[in-house]
Amino acid sequence: MTRALAVEWGPHGVTVNAIAPGYMMTPDNMGNALRADPVQRARFADRTALRRWGQAHELDGAVIYLAGEAGAYCTGHTLVVDGGMTVKI
C-alpha cells in the first residue's frame, strides 16, 4: 500500500512512507500475561540482534527523518526499526 500510494501521490508532491517497528515496550504491547512473565519477555527480546525490547521514543528519529527535510526525496519506503529482528530471521 505504501508503494502504491507513493506512486499515486508523488506527482502531487506528496511523499508516502511507513515505519515497521519491532517489539516495542509500550503499555499496549506489554499485556498482563507478558508483563508477569519475564521468561516470555526474554524470549521475545532474544529474537532481536540487540537482545532487548525497543522503547517507543526510539521511533522518534525515524518519524523526524521521514517527515522532515532530510527525507524529502524518500517515498515508497518502509523503514524497519526492529532492533535487528529481521536480520535474524
Label every PLM stretch briefly.
Residues A4, D60-G61:
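Alpha-helical macromolecular-interaction surfaces
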Residues T48-L59, A70:
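A conserved structural motif in NAD(P)-dependent oxidoreductases
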Residues G10, T15, C74-G76:
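Short, small/polar-rich loop/turn modules that mediate ligand/substrate recognition or access, typified
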Residues T15-M25, A67-A70, V80-D82:
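Conserved SDR Rossmann-fold cofactor-binding beta-strand/turn motif
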Residues P11, Y23-T48:
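A glycine/serine/threonine-rich, flexible loop-to-helix segment
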Residues M1-L5, W9, I19, L66:
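Hydrophobic alpha-helix immediately C-terminal to the catalytic Tyr-X-X-X-Lys motif of short-chain
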Residues V63-I64, T75-I89:
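Short C-terminal tail/terminal secondary-structure segment
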